[in-house]
C-alpha cells in the first residue's frame, strides 16, 4: 500500500485517495453520535501585529479559526487523525452534509471518514451544480475583513483616482511579485498596499529595511520591482517582526498573496483580466 507524501507545513498528498489500514494504526475512542453541527476549534494561535511575541491584551489580532458549536464525533475524528499523522497541527475538524469530515490544516482541506480509514485530498465537486465546494470553503475560511488589515504597516501606491483597492504580501526577491507589478503598470485607478514580507532569501530583510526606511518608500519599491534599481542603504526601525507576525496570523506561506476589499484572497500573480474582475 502506498502511503502519503508530505512537504513542509503545507502538506501535499501525492495520492488523492488512500487507505489507512486499521491493522497498522489503532483507532481512538468511539465517538458519540452528533447532531450535524460543526466541530469546535481549539484556542486560536494569534500573534500581535506590534511584535513577534504572542498577543497581549489590547493588541490587534486575527483569528485563524471560526467559532463552532461542540461536536463530540468531530472531536473524536480530530483525535484519531492526530494519532495517525503526528506532527501536523490540525486547525479544526468539521462534519459535512455529504457524509465526510472536513479536516482543516492551515488553509489546506482534506476529507476523511469517521474512523479515519480513508483520507482524500483534492477538489470536492457538487455533482448537481458543478461547484468546486473545496475552493469555496477555502476562500471562506481564509477571508479577512479588509478594513481590519493594519494598512499603516504597508507601503501605499496610488494610480489615478485610487478607487480600486487591494493589499499584497510581497518579498523583494519574488519573481512572481515582479510579474504582478508589470501587470499593475497597465492598470489605472488603483491603490495597492504592500506588506513587505521577507521570507525568500537571506538578503530579503536587508532590502525591505532599505525600502521602508527610504524617504519615499513607494518610489523606491517601484524602482526595484519594476526597473531593477537596487534600494540605497537606509536605516530605521523597520517593523519586520510585525510583518512576519501578520503573515503568520493570516497563514501567508508564499508571495504574492493578494487580499481584496471583498474579503477574498488569492495566492499568486493573476493575469490582468482576472485581477480586473476581482477589483
UniProtKB/Swiss-Prot annotation:
Region of interest (Disordered), residue spans? 33-73
Q: Does the keyword Disulfide bond apply?
A: yes
Q: Where is the signal peptide?
A: 1-31
Where is this protein chiefly located? Answer: periplasm
Question: Which Pfam families does the record cross-reference, listed alphabetically?
Answer: DsbC_N (PF10411), Thioredoxin_2 (PF13098)
Q: Family membership, please give it.
A: Belongs to the thioredoxin family. DsbC subfamily.
Species: Bordetella pertussis (strain Tohama I / ATCC BAA-589 / NCTC 13251)
* Name of the molecule in the record: Probable thiol:disulfide interchange protein DsbC
- The keyword Signal belongs to this UniProt entry's keyword annotation: yes
Q: Where is the composition biased (Low complexity)?
A: 33-44
